[in-house]
Structures are given as C-alpha cells and as structure tokens.
Amino acid sequence: MIIVLLGPPGAGKGTQGELLAARLGIPKIATGDLFRAAVRDSTPLGIEAKKYMDRGDLVPDSVILGILRDAMASAEAAHGAILDGAVRTVPQAEGLAQVLKSIDRKVDAVLLFDANHAELIRRLSSRTTCDICQTPFKAFEPGTACPRNDGGRLIRRKDDEPEAIQNRLSIYEELTAPVVAWYQTHGVPVERIDAIGDVTDVTMRAAEALKHVPRAD
C-alpha cells in the first residue's frame, strides 16, 4: 500500500506517518528527512535544497522527484510506503504518478490531516530543532542540549520563525490544497483526519480510515 500524507505545516504528519508505518509494516519515506541528510552532508542537492528550506519555500519538483524515484525503487519500499512531504503541488502529484507508473505502482490512498491556523502557528512557533540530528522538539528553549544526547544544541529554525510560518501556510493554501481535488478526480480515496487532540487518538482516526482502503500488496 502506498499512502500519501497531506496537511499544512505543523499538522503532525511526520509523527503520524511513523506511527502508521509501524502499524502497517511499511517504511515512512519523508522528503524532509532526505533533504536534511543531504544538508548535513553538504551534498550538491543539500546545498540547493537548503536555500529553499531556509526561506520556507517549496523545493523544486525536479529535486523532489529525483529523490523519490530512488527511494521508491529500493527494496525497502517493495511492499509499499507512507510518503510524507512528497506531494505538495499538483505537478508533484502528476510527477509522482508517473514515477510510480514506471515501476507498476500507484498511490492507494491519501490521508489529509486538518488543523486550524491558530493551532498550527502555536505548534510551530514553540518548536526547536537539534542542530546535529535535526530532530524537532516541543517545549524546549533554544540553546538546550538535545534530549537525544548526541552533543547537539536546540535551535529555532529559520522556517519556524513567525514570518516564515505565515509564508509556509500561505504556500500550502495556494499550492497544496488543490492536490486534494486532483486525487479525488483521479479516483484516489482521500480521507480527512482531525489532527487536533492526543497523538494516539489521531493515529486511531487515521487507522480507522484506512480500514476501507484495499491493500495493493
């Protein structure tokens, strides 16, 4: 089963993707994690991606699809995957469909995590990130030692500053929301999930929604 996660920044897609991947026994493939690894290693892709990420802008489709093509062709994704951050625009949805078609695969379902703007801004503005492992944390002040004890310090990422948050939400509304309509018109089930509340409750809502989606693998 190949599942695309959609939703605005701060909706908790990353956390829910990990929990659902464990339940389904398939990997979560997050473009954000791939980009951060590339940035950490200062690869040409990482340097290019960082310019966009620091501004809170979307990384170009050519970069995203190149990474996804390799990830989806890997043995790890042979029985499916949960894609987080892979599709944010209609051209990306179209590009992903072509990439999957080339390996005789398709998107089986879309989970759309919803939350109001006030909650999203509250979540994002209170988030700090380890400058080494790039793991985000809530309720920790900048300068605090990373809870993972990797020697890193928590920082406020540029794209988690108020101005960048507003920019990211505006981009989502303008470019990402139409992706929902695209998938619906192409016959892909789109399940809306209330992302407000306890993490476990949100996971249960998503798992319940997936019960009615046929598994391809």
Regions found by a protein language model. Give the residues of each.
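Glycine-rich phosphate-binding loop of ATP-dependent small-molecule kinases
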Residues: 1-217
